[in-house]
């Protein structure tokens, strides 16, 4: 009987069920997030090429600089002088988290659709060579801005309206979309 008891004890001691488990450990870390003010842009003024005339024989263009300068070329000419022409760059207000930098982008070209004076559709005109002036950079040519201590910056956008020879009198409109993103 004693031999059976020793064999039974030996069988229990060597059983995998009774074997010691391996060592384990745990660790804890942190999860975190910082929520900041969303960045937004609001249009304040439209890009306005003013009132102009078009030559019957020569194509032309009018360029409005982001800083406000205007240049007529080729067959495009102002319809009148001074404020009557109504030329101005577009202006946008950007707001978000104070002190943050951001990037602004514009399309390469936008298309202005027209309505003929007296009705009907006019041929589309291209607006290209869009330029930027960011108040936070004092007029330097850049697409990276900096929000001030109030979380604001202002952007001016200029561009060039291309006018084919013989363009009929019409009212033109285009949508100018800018995109601002935090850097």
What is each PLM-predicted segment?
Residues 20-114, 144-183:
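N-terminal small/polar-rich segments of proteins
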Residues 103-105, 111-143:
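Terminal beta-strand-rich extracellular "head" domains
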């Amino acid at each position: 009987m004693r031999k059976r008891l020793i064999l039974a004890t030996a069988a229990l001691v060597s059983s995998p069920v009774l074997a010691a488990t391996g060592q384990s450990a745990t660790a804890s870390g942190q999860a975190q997030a910082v929520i900041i003010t969303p960045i937004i842009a609001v249009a304040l003024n439209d890009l306005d090429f003013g009132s102009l005339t078009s030559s019957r024989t020569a194509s032309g263009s009018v360029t409005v600089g982001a800083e406000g300068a205007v240049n007529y070329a080729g067959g495009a000419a102002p319809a009148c002088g001074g404020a009557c022409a109504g030329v101005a760059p577009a202006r946008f207000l950007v707001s978000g988290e104070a002190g943050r930098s951001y990037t602004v982008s514009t399309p390469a070209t936008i298309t202005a659709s027209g309505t003929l004076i007296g009705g009907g559709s006019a041929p589309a005109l291209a607006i290209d060579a869009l330029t930027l002036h960011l108040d936070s950079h004092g007029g330097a040519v850049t697409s990276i801005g900096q929000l001030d201590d109030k979380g604001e910056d202002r952007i001016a956008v200029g561009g060039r309206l291309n006018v084919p020879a013989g363009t009929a009198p019409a009212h033109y409109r285009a949508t100018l979309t800018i995109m601002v993103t935090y850097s």
